[in-house]
């Protein structure tokens, strides 16, 4: 009896504390009329509008929410549009034949229009500790949300979102924007602010720490002090995140057009180590090693390519970032084992990529390309005869040449610079000129294979067959 009373008291007290926290975090709801914001329906995907209109017509609340609203208010073009509603996932599926339900941790409806997917989420609610809540919401021992399918009201949903600037709701019914957490003011002031208690929210989902840094770099905003303070202390929580999810997050961080700024902030908040432990071991106090210079340069180059709408390949990014740890590993294996350098290099590739894949589940299709780029580095100086032409026929030659140029740039190595310049001229030359360049090479001729002489047989003794 005493235990039941104690549990009841704890439940009431925790609920009162939770409600008190919410009251502090939630300002009075602000409705921003059409004439006071920049969102226009012409800038919204037609398919997103179809979803909103059909949900409204069926009697459900429905709003555009998240990054789409944020970007529209900032005058940017959103990459995608998310919808939130009081309709359950099953109710959404009944309204749309082109819908499928996804996710176990967060149950979502994906309404598919060809290549475009409109994500529809039901308003999230708070866990009140009831038996039914325990079956639809689960936490790990470290506070991480393992499952969260408790539905609630729009007010609760606003509190459950991560950052205030992502908790703005656009209504297609009256063209207003609803703000429950002061997100509009933070957006105008350029502040990334977590909703609720930062440490609790980071423990629920440690990836929020990466998102804070990503949004700060992407939107050129600052992270509020209370949102930033716990990050270095809690950075190791990322070790509990599945490597496949961290791989996807790493691409969003480093290959979205703001990679260099994001990289600097990841280092500042101690978030780089859980993603790239191999690389972090080689960081220097001044940040001026060849490895750190090549990482900075490859990220700047990647940002420029994305701004110019050019293709980027994660395999090249990883090849550049892990190049100097690979060299050190190969040298160490060669010295300790007595293997030829080429064999030690092959073993080092395995070791470096195996460790990288333990924190980031880099797909095999990318690690294979990364290996190709690395192996070609050893062949770039061997240009005699037909080797140069054969090398240029390799599918990853261009990427390997780009890495060679990067190495020459960051190492300030005269020999590497001459080699990179030679390859640049060779690629741009006509076949007769290429032949002349090969003839002029001062390099030593390629070593010829020695013919193995037949062994001399011992003279036969008399009487033997």
From Swiss-Prot:
Gene Ontology BP term (one): polyadenylation-dependent RNA catabolic process
Disordered: annotated segments: 430-465
List of catalytic residues: 80, 82, 162
Catalytic activity: RNA(n) + ATP = RNA(n)-3'-adenine ribonucleotide + diphosphate
Keywords: ATP-binding, mRNA processing, Nucleotide-binding, RNA-binding, Transcription, Transferase
GO molecular function list: ATP binding; poly(A) RNA polymerase activity; RNA binding
EC class (word): transferase
Biased composition (Basic residues): 448-459
Pfam short name (any one): PolyA_pol_arg_C
Superkingdom per UniProt: Bacteria
EC numbers: 2.7.7.19
Similarity comment: family membership: Belongs to the tRNA nucleotidyltransferase/poly(A) polymerase family.
Functional note: Adds poly(A) tail to the 3' end of many RNAs, which usually targets these RNAs for decay. Plays a significant role in the global control of gene expression, through influencing the rate of transcript degradation, and in the general RNA quality control.
Matching NCBIfam families: pcnB, PRK11623.1
Protein's recorded name: Poly(A) polymerase I
Originating species: Salmonella typhi
